Each structure stands twice: as C-alpha cells, then as structure tokens.
Amino acid sequence: MASNTPVCDFGWQAVDFELEDTHASRHTLASLRGPNGLLLMFICNHCPYVKAVIDRICRDARDLQALGIGVAAIMSNDPVEYPEDSMENMQRVAEQLAFSFPYLHDTTQAVARAYGAVCTPDFFGFNQQLQLQYRGRLDASGRLPAGPHVRRELFEAMREVAATGHGPR
C-alpha cells in the first residue's frame, strides 16, 4: 500500500456509488454532497496512521460540515483479511468516536478502485459540482501529535473550496 497520496487531478469528476453505512442506511454522492462540496475519506480501523489522526479527522469533519461541506468515510478493506475492519467494528468505532459523518462499507472495493484510493487515510475534496479540488494530507504531522503551529492543510483547502469552488494549486 502506498504511503503518499498522488497529485491532485483537478477537475476530475467524482464517480457515483451507492454504499451502506454503519446504520444500514444507503448513501449516494447526491445524498452526501453538501451545498458547498463533499469530502470523501478512505479510512479503516486497523491502520496505525488513521488511529493516530482520527481525532483530528473528526474535528476537521465537524468544522467542514459547519461550512456546508458534506463528509463521508469509506472503508474498503476485506474484513476476512482484516478482522478489525468488520462491520461490527466499524459500528463500534463510529459510535465510540461519535462520527458526525456516515461511515460507509465498500464491500467489493469497487469504489476504492474507481477513485484510485491508494492509502489510508486518503482524502478527496470536491466542489459543489463534484469536481476534485483537493487530494492531499490532513496536515504535516503524520502520525505524530499535531503541535499548536501545525497547519490544518485539509481543513484550509476545503474551506477555500467552500468559499470559492476551487482548491489550492
């Protein structure tokens, strides 16, 4: 699995899908999109990087939702290969961390392949027309705790998308 996200393909059109969340509700791009865009995050329960940054992911998701950005997380791993990523464990994690966003299960990995997701977490930020405007990291701290001066790169980029429809280049 790659450890770095590829360069953003600005303007790439989001691929539609329909996936079930941890509450057995089904979601599509249209149902997830906020008035100012959409952030899709490929995450999983077992990844040490996700575990290290999940509190910051939750914070940024709440802050972006307040700006009219829809947010969803997608888990595409095979739970047979990674038992920690089972639906039951997805439900437990979403509840324990009080996810403010749907946590979707991509059982066939078709959505991950369609998006070219290569690592976890992998962030895809779209404008209101569902054109890709951000593909990058959460911040520069990686798995380390974020210090007080660490830029919130994902949040800042998506705030720009919410305000202008365009991400940073």
Indicate where each model-derived feature is located.
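Chalcogenol-based redox active-site neighborhoods
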Residues: 1-163, 167-169
